[in-house]
Amino acid sequence: AVLCHGVLGYLEQPEPLVNQLCRSAEAGGIVSIMTANANAMAVRPALERRWDDALASFDTRTEIGVLGVPGRADTVEELSDLVRARGVEPLRWYGVWLFVDWLGFSGVELDPSDSQQVVATAAVELEAGRRDPYRQLSRVFHLVGRKGPS
């Protein structure tokens, strides 16, 4: 498997890295990419009550992210087209960190020492991450594909 989680959005042009990822996978191997969701750019500023920024985010793909550095976002469709053109067939995509991403904004914290709470949270996140419309609102998405025969 070839994994690239949280890197693509820091590159101005994703194509060179996507080329390398797809080329590195063996026939039948998995390519796994996580990146920012261009269709949900308004979520974070809206949750932070930065209404002007949220309104502007509907028409942008760039932001200063949580790490304080510029980043860009992709759509599931565009990234699927990129990997498909390089011999990797997209299998599924998931929304990532949908509800846990919002906890801090609501004043609620997840207690990592409460194993029952962690298990329940993970179950809800997994279910939301694979269902529409929930996964479409995730600020990050996870695309999983399989490389075709050589």
Per-range role (PLM):
Residues 92, 96-150:
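A C-terminal cap/extension of S-adenosyl-L-methionine-dependent methyltransferases
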Residues 66-70, 130-132:
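Active-site rim elements
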Residues 30-59:
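Conserved class I S-adenosyl-L-methionine
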Residues 6-7:
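Short catalytic micro-motifs in class I SAM-dependent methyltransferases
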Residues 68-93:
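Short alpha-helix
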Residues 3:
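A conserved beta-strand element that flanks and buttresses the S-adenosyl-L-methionine
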